[in-house]
Amino acid sequence: MTVAVYPGSFDPITKGHMDIVERAAQIFHEVIVAVVINPNKKPLFTMDERVEMIRMAVSHISNVRVESFSGLLVDFTRKQGARAIVRGLRAVSDFEVEFQMALMNKRLYPEVETVFMATHTDYAFLSSSMVKEVASFGGDVSDYLPPAVLARMAEKYGDTVRGKAPVR
């Protein structure tokens, strides 16, 4: 049974992330969406909120589970019995950084393979940071987020993120 880990901060999880999760779930027996605690980032959503939103977003996929972790990805991957790390690539610039991380992960955990998945062209421009920025200015981000996540964004930024005009 091949287990894969798909790591990220997922603040919030987007439809681009979901595309990777759904496709990885078709390849691997089990996919663990690993929500990382990154002390260098100031998240919009707490760890518990992110885990909860992701669990709601992936609830229709039977072979996906969601966990949080801190520390080295390879340590988490090894503890989970996973042999693959899934990474989504939006552009060549993503590959530069991801390739270096894959090589380091291989050094630290020789049994692990990094699997790069090209993002669907509909989401090649998309990032959590971009979604948060658009939402912070009252923009409509409804095309980019799973429904449960969109509801949480509306709680933070108001209904304009759903494409609804503010009530006057």
From Swiss-Prot:
Reactions this protein catalyses: (R)-4'-phosphopantetheine + ATP + H(+) = 3'-dephospho-CoA + diphosphate
Function according to Swiss-Prot or TrEMBL: Reversibly transfers an adenylyl group from ATP to 4'-phosphopantetheine, yielding dephospho-CoA (dPCoA) and pyrophosphate.
CDD domains, per the entry: PPAT
GO MF, one example: pantetheine-phosphate adenylyltransferase activity
Organism this protein belongs to: Heliobacterium modesticaldum (strain ATCC 51547 / Ice1)
Residues reported in the UniProt entry to bind ATP: S9, F10, H17, G88, L89, R90, E98, Y123, A124, F125, L126, S127, S128, S129
Coiled coil (UniProt feature): none
Record-linked InterPro entries: Cyt_trans-like (IPR004821), PPAT (IPR001980), Rossmann-like_a/b/a_fold (IPR014729)
Required cofactor names: Mg(2+)
Protein's name according to its UniProt entry: Phosphopantetheine adenylyltransferase
Pfam family, one: CTP_transf_like
Keyword terms: ATP-binding, Coenzyme A biosynthesis, Cytoplasm, Magnesium, Nucleotide-binding, Nucleotidyltransferase, Transferase
Pathway(s) the chain acts in: Cofactor biosynthesis; coenzyme A biosynthesis; CoA from (R)-pantothenate: step 4/5
Annotated positions binding substrate: S9, K41, L73, R87
Transmembrane stretches, start-end: none
Example of a GO biological process term: coenzyme A biosynthetic process
Location of this chain's protein in the cell: Cytoplasm
CC per GO annotation: cytoplasm
Record flagged with keyword ATP-binding: yes
E.C. designation(s): 2.7.7.3
Enzyme class: transferase
Subunit annotation: Homohexamer.
